[in-house]
């Protein structure tokens, strides 16, 4: 299922000032939309390079925490309705937005933050590296 790819900051809470959750004060936007052309190219490249894995697009939220607590996961899910939660994308997206630079965030998801992971992290890491290398070899010539 495809949705607009964008990044939001899950840690930012200036709601006491009337801002919505995730709004960075004095920013003129609530989220940082990724470049749609780059998203389409990344999806096409990944589907060709890694047909064995699923590709999803949509809202990504970033925060300065590993999500391992069920209540934190549910709070973030109910506030932001993300496809995934990670730690780095909002900083990259905000810098790209402020400098008017196109960007796309590509993530390999290791777990669902609910103790249901089916492989250990070292195994996941090796697979993610192999998938990432194949993806980049396919994507870079396209951009």
Predicted regions mapped to residue ranges:
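Electropositive phosphate-/nucleotide-binding environments in soluble metabolic enzymes
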Residues: 32-40, 70, 86, 90, ...
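Active-site-adjacent mobile loop/cap segments within catalytic or ligand-binding domains
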Residues: 71, 75-86, 90-125
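Alpha-helical scaffold segments in soluble metabolic enzymes
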Residues: 41-45, 75, 91, 131-138
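Short, small-residue-biased leader/transition segments that mark boundaries at the very start
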Residues: 2-7
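Active-site rim beta-loop-alpha module in soluble metabolic enzymes
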Residues: 9-84, 95, 99
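His/Asp/Glu-rich mid-to-C-terminal helical/loop segments that flank catalytic regions of hydrolases
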Residues: 113-143
């Amino acid at each position: 299922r495809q949705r607009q790819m964008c990044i939001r900051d899950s840690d930012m809470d200036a709601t006491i000032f009337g801002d919505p959750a995730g709004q960075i004060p004095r920013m003129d936007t609530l989220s940082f939309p990724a470049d749609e052309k780059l998203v389409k190219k990344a999806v096409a490249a990944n589907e060709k390079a890694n047909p064995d894995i699923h590709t999803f697009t949509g809202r990504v939220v970033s925060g300065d925490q590993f999500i391992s607590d069920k209540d934190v996961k549910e709070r973030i899910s109910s506030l932001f309705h993300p496809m995934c939660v990670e730690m780095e994308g909002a900083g990259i997206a905000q810098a790209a937005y402020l400098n008017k630079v196109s960007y796309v965030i590509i993530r390999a998801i290791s777990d669902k933050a609910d103790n249901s992971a089916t492989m250990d992290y070292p195994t996941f890491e090796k697979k993610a590296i192999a998938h990432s290398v194949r993806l980049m070899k396919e994507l870079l010539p396209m951009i």
